[in-house]
Regions:
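Short, charged helix-capping/linker segments at alpha-helix termini
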Residues: 1-11, 21-40, 48-55
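Short amphipathic alpha-helical boundary/capping segments
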Residues: 9-11, 104-113
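Residue-level preference for hydrophobic side chains embedded in well-ordered alpha helices
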Residues: 12, 16, 20, 41, ...
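Residues within helix-turn-helix
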Residues: 32, 131, 142
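Arg/Lys-rich amphipathic alpha helix in sigma70-family domain 2
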Residues: 63-84, 97-98
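DNA-recognition helix of helix-turn-helix
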Residues: 137-161
Length: 169
């Protein structure tokens, strides 16, 4: 990686880290695990930076994070460890109730199967289209739609007091 590439990489990392860390947190449900996931994905992305700089480096990094997390879930399942993370970080009361809804949504996301959780994160937190999600996950648009439908149905069961917006393609 030459000096020009290093400068572009540093600029990319500085500008996109907050958004990508949010995705990592939503995938893992844990701040420390999110940091590890992001750093691991970034380490795998840097050697390919020269070829990515003109394409979609953020999309590539997001896909690497997703695949790394799926590998972790699979290893966890093989060991038959079931570990749900505990307490959310302490927050001040939000008079509008927005914080409570966000915390409830984070907790509910942890109860979704990994594939459904990932689709929800990419569709609604990252605001990707169904086509973009399908490309990132290496599946069909129909699969994205069915996972989204099942995930939203489950979230409605888990959060009966939270009004979820209608899901549209």
């Amino acid at each position: 990686v030459d000096e020009d590439d290093r400068a572009r990489l540093a600029e990319f990392v500085a500008s996109r880290t907050p958004a990508l860390m949010r995705v990592a947190y939503l995938l893992t449900g844990d701040r420390h695990a999110a940091e590890d996931l992001f750093q691991s994905a970034l380490a795998r992305t840097i050697p390919k930076w020269r070829t990515l700089r003109h394409a979609d480096p953020e999309g590539y990094l997001r896909t690497v994070m997703y695949r790394e997390q799926v590998s972790w879930w699979r290893r966890l399942r093989r060991r038959r460890e079931i570990a749900l993370t505990g307490a959310d970080e302490a927050v001040q009361q939000d008079p509008s109730g927005g914080t409570d809804v966000r915390l409830a949504m984070r907790a509910a996301l942890r109860h979704l199967p990994p594939a459904q959780r990932t689709v929800v994160v990419l569709r609604y937190y990252e605001d990707l289209t169904e086509t973009q999600v399908a490309e990132a996950l290496g599946c069909t648009v129909g699969t994205v739609r069915s996972r989204t439908h099942r995930a939203v149905s489950r979230l409605r069961q888990l959060l009966p007091d939270v009004e979820l917006l209608e899901v549209r393609p």
